[in-house]
Amino acid sequence: MTLRPGQMTLADLRHIYQHPVKITLDESAYAPIQQSVDCVQKILAEKRTAYGINTGFGLLASTRIATEDLENLQRSIVLSHAAGVGEPNDDAIVRLIMVLKINSLARGFSGIRLEVIQALITLVNAQVYPHIPLKGSVGASGDLAPLAHMSLLLLGEGKARYQGEWLDARAALAKAGLQPLTLAAKEGLALLNGTQVSTAYALRGLFEAEDLYAAASVFGSLTVEAALGSRSPFDARIHAVRGQRGQIDAARTYRHLLGERSEVSESHRNCDKVQDPYSLRCQPQVMGACLTQMRQAAEVLAIESNAVSDNPLVFADQGDVLSGGNFHAEPVAMAADNLALALAEIGSLAERRISLLMDKHMSQLPPFLVENGGVNSGFMIAQVTAAALTSENKGLAFPSSVDSIPTSANQEDHVSMAPRAGKRLWEMAENVRGILAVEWLAACQGLDLRKGLKTSDALEPARLLLRKHVAYYEKDRFFAPDIEAASQLIALRHMNELMPAHLLPSL
């Protein structure tokens, strides 16, 4: 993959998250990188004072640093700021963080040498991933602690994972053919300052939300069939007169999945039903709103993934070094909060569809989707599990961006909490996956109870896939393994293949 700074797409970023990559930096980046370094060197030669180059940091910004201490200053900031806690991030997230940092630094506004950027690229290509703890950033003044842990490896400090094994830093560098670096003026701060960890966390949340949106669309369509629901609410004319783009596209997705008719729909063409419950009928409205939130969040995250969020910034053409606040991850935090709303609603609507299938008066199916009820409890407690997960997500959906706590002796007196905003999306996604696993099981059970009638051509593959791994419930059995099997299948992203093209931002 050739990296052209500032031009990465969401599809590129999804690929980097999901797969090891080999990166080459486009040569067009070399000149701007060198010009920014030359600008820093000129400031030092002229003995001008510039924050982050020859001063302390944060509340210590007014402290001038002697020339002979500048290299030690950069090493010290990395060592002192590597104060994260918690479990290490997995390789996929670390790889994404590193590529986002490379993409930002290579735009040529950070005053960092090509040698340092190439070292990060070499580590990514060799699949040597530094130990970056999950916790320790508030998403303002950048993701200082986690990015310091990333940068430790370049200095020969800390540890890294290579092929699943933890190695001390020098041994890990050797696997990539590297030696420890000595950072020059400005370089330590350039490595530490930025929103790359916050953005990586939120991107993972986006990718998982997209995958779950696809699965929920498929399983919601299966539930329409299992509950003998109508196709009329998905008619394009209904959605066109409202004009909401997400709703229009969601309805198109349901039409694509359900088709004009199926054996199931033909079996109840002439019935006395007038309207379906909202959890079936209003899927385009609810899922369309979720799709809109996801698209808006994706736009913000795509911009941030290509942004320069360092401080100070080096504008070599004018010879200026300017202090600002691009490290403040408020856009990322708000985008993640919107994704949380979408995830919560995707799960909530799915849980209501499960409940509908359980209720014999609503679905006209045996109570709890099992024959010989009383002796058998069927899906009774599986629905309770889905309800528990749904309720848990309501609490997790509380916005993180409205939380702030002052740090650094009140110099950094407002923060975004973007890492928390992004990281909780992973837990929410896991909960939604569990809810959707139950719906998939329930919808397929309901369809099997419809005398083996086939659903649409687009939906039959989803039904058959589940039945390859989970059998029909003739009577009660140990339920948890079936939920886990369905959940694992969802995690493989098969449902993405059933979506119309260009529906979801990164697919």
Curated annotation (Swiss-Prot):
InterPro entries in the record: Aromatic_Lyase, Fumarase/histidase_N, HutH, L-Aspartase-like, Phe/His_NH3-lyase_AS
Catalytic activity, EC: 4.3.1.3
Catalytic activity: L-histidine = trans-urocanate + NH4(+)
Family matches, as PROSITE patterns: PAL_HISTIDASE
Primary subcellular site in the record, as a coarse category: cytoplasm
Positions of crosslink type 5-imidazolinone (Ala-Gly): A140-G142
Record's keyword annotation contains Lyase: yes
Family (UniProt): Belongs to the PAL/histidase family.
Record-given protein name: Histidine ammonia-lyase
Originating species: Yersinia enterocolitica serotype O:8 / biotype 1B (strain NCTC 13174 / 8081)
Classification lineage: Bacteria, Pseudomonadati, Pseudomonadota, Gammaproteobacteria, Enterobacterales
